[in-house]
Amino acid sequence: MFEGPLQDLIDELSRLPGVGPKSAQRIAFHLLNVDPTDITRLQEALGGVRDGVQFCRICCNISREEVCRICSDSGRDGGTICVVEEPKDIQVIERTGEFSGRYHVLGGALDPLANIGPRELNISTLLQRIGGVLPDRELADSTPENKLFDATPTVREVILATDPNTEGEATASYLGRLLKDFPDLVVSRLASGMPLGGDLEFVDELTLSRALSGRLQI
């Protein structure tokens, strides 16, 4: 154990995902030896994330504006919505060049062990985008007033692109049941070939591109 600010820094770095005590210690000692201007830039970047990043009021993606660039792009196909767990998943799909529709970010996946249920995810806003009504009263009660908006009547298909693990599959199954209440809406899931038990961000672009183009209706 070190003392003072150094140990405080190590402790805070250790709280980051994927950073263990040894990695945190290496990062901390690296920061001790970098130019002060680099530290200043890091501080400014951290402050910018805290103060300059918000979530799109339509799709819940990370955005600098009230509406993100994808939702604002009239060239995107508003009739197809790809549902993902996290904003980082959008970047993975965009790199394939296979999808030209719009997205909806759930903000996670169903996980009863972590007390994450439908009310903790951005499901109610997804249902409103599609049909403007909430068939599940519990979801309706959980919708913040400032997130209400008109439905997009042109939505033809919803692609469920949650992670191919236990939580992601449970989330896709739950959404599939909910979305069956909307007439004339096609609900599809990424095709087989995705590695089971993994995260979408680690799937290579070719595999993901094939999974998108060969998606299966559910």
Curated annotation (Swiss-Prot):
Query: Which InterPro entries does its entry note?
Result: DNA_Rcmb_RecR (IPR000093), Hlx-hairpin-Hlx_DNA-bd_motif (IPR003583), Rcmb_RecR (IPR023627), Rcmb_RecR_Znf (IPR015967), TOPRIM_dom (IPR006171), TOPRIM_RecR (IPR034137)
Q: Does the keyword Metal-binding apply?
A: yes
A Gene Ontology molecular function term of the record: zinc ion binding
Domain of life here?
Bacteria
Sequence ranges assigned to domain Toprim in this UniProt record: 79-195
Would the keyword Metal-binding turn up in this protein's UniProt record? yes
List the PROSITE patterns: RECR (PS01300), TOPRIM (PS50880)
- Keywords of this protein's UniProt record, alphabetized? DNA damage, DNA recombination, DNA repair, Metal-binding, Zinc, Zinc-finger
Q: Tell me, which GO biological process terms does this entry list?
A: DNA recombination; DNA repair
Which residues form the C4-type zinc fingers? 56-71
Stated family: Belongs to the RecR family.
Question: What is the annotated role of this protein in its UniProt record?
Answer: May play a role in DNA repair. It seems to be involved in an RecBC-independent recombinational process of DNA repair. It may act with RecF and RecO.
Protein name, per record: Recombination protein RecR
